[in-house]
Amino acid sequence: MNNINKIFITFLCIELIIGGGGRLLEPLGIFPLRYLLFVFSFILLIFNLVTFNFSITQKCVSLFIWLLLFPFYGFFVGLLAGNKINDILFDVQPYLFMLSLIYLFTLRYTLKVFSCEIFIKIVNAFALYGSLLYISYIILLNFGLLNFNLIYEHLSLTSEFFFRPDGAFFSKSFYFFGVGAIISFVDKKYLKCLIIVLAILLTESRGVLLFTTLSLLLASFKLHKLYLNTIIIILGSVLFIIMLYMVGSRSEDSDSVRFNDLYFYYKNVDLATFLFGRGFGSFILDRLRIEIVPLEILQKTGVIGVFISLVPMLLIFLKGYFLNSTKTSLMMSLILFFSITVSITNPFLFTPMGIFIIGVVVLWVFSIENIQISNNLTSGAK
């Protein structure tokens, strides 16, 4: 069973990291692999339970229950508000992937360690080789050595890619460039980190660049002295200014959409909405989903929902960043920090990609790390 679990975990990581939003195979008419993996995780869970090939920690169970409170709350507020059931279910859909965390959280200790290690390895490989490939694409495109129309014709068949007018593009899997940059920086592989950050710059995604840089700065505060932190602040500021210059007036459309969303909430909020929200299935202007995730949470679940969703994230981050002492805990906490903050401008955290990251971080910070510390204390006592 262990080998079967390892193969499944490896394939799951590859699909989530490289597959991004899960729509790469959309043009082929193939049933989404993500749904099949979701179902298969429950089949494996049953086999693990039947064969006693599982391990449960109280903290993982407590955090899992707390994580589920948020979609349950949004669902019931939506029902009480009289929102259409189809719209409510549309909002619930991304959170269903949280149920797959039951599989992760009940794995045996060795498989939990394997899950975290294989996740880091696959992100490392994808971030580096994906960045090199993307940088090569931009160079060849600017030298006129690529047929952009042909590339656009093929890649635009799926909704996974978002093209810029100058030929640059962003894929949802590119969020893992930011994760890879954090891993490389904490591992002190600075050249690799710079290559990945350069690729992020060339995607022209301001939010990903900004919050990757902030995550690297937080890592530097723990790892380096003041002069290196200053260098990172200056370098990050320069890169962001370059990004703003590259994007230019093209950012006005997306900025105006975000501003209109904020203005709509401001004009329509009342005390009940502010406290309890309007529930899942409620709209901001004519959309169920918006780019500013915190605003969407506030609109649909109020400050109560913000509190419910934020508390477990803060607990995980604070424990990994301040209380645990290992390099991997620092890495994991900053990956979570990036996932939370990048969701201010791009929906990421409560997607299958973001939910899986939450699961992996919880595994390390609240399960693996605790057992390792306990074992070290026991060894020391002997």
Curated annotation (Swiss-Prot):
Cytoplasmic side: 1-3, 55-62, 113-125, 188-189, 227-229, 319-329, 371-382
Consequences of knocking out this gene: Mutants produce a semi-rough LPS, which contains only one O-antigen repeat unit.
Enzyme Commission designation: 2.4.99.27
Topology with respect to the bilayer: Multi-pass membrane protein
Keyword Membrane: yes
Residues exposed to the Periplasmic side: 23-34, 82-94, 147-167, 207-208, 248-300, 350-352
Principal cellular location given in the protein's record: membrane
Known pathway: Bacterial outer membrane biogenesis; LPS O-antigen biosynthesis
GO cellular component: plasma membrane
Entry's Gene Ontology molecular function annotations: transferase activity
GO biological process: lipopolysaccharide biosynthetic process
Record field: catalytic activity: n lipid-linked O-antigen repeat units = a lipid-linked O antigen + (n-1) polyisoprenyl diphosphate
Keyword Repeat: no
Bilayer-spanning residue ranges: 4-22, 35-54, 63-81, 95-112, 126-146, 168-187, 190-206, 209-226, 230-247, 301-318, 330-349, 353-370
Top-rank taxon, per record: Bacteria
Enzyme class: transferase
Keywords: Cell inner membrane, Cell membrane, Lipopolysaccharide biosynthesis, Membrane, Transferase, Transmembrane, Transmembrane helix
Annotated localization: Cell inner membrane
Role this protein plays: Polymerase involved in the biosynthesis of the lipopolysaccharide (LPS). Catalyzes the polymerization of the O-antigen repeat units on the periplasmic face of the inner membrane, leading to the formation of the lipid-linked O-antigen molecule.
Identification of the protein by name: O-antigen polymerase
Species: Shigella flexneri
Lineage: Bacteria, Pseudomonadati, Pseudomonadota, Gammaproteobacteria, Enterobacterales
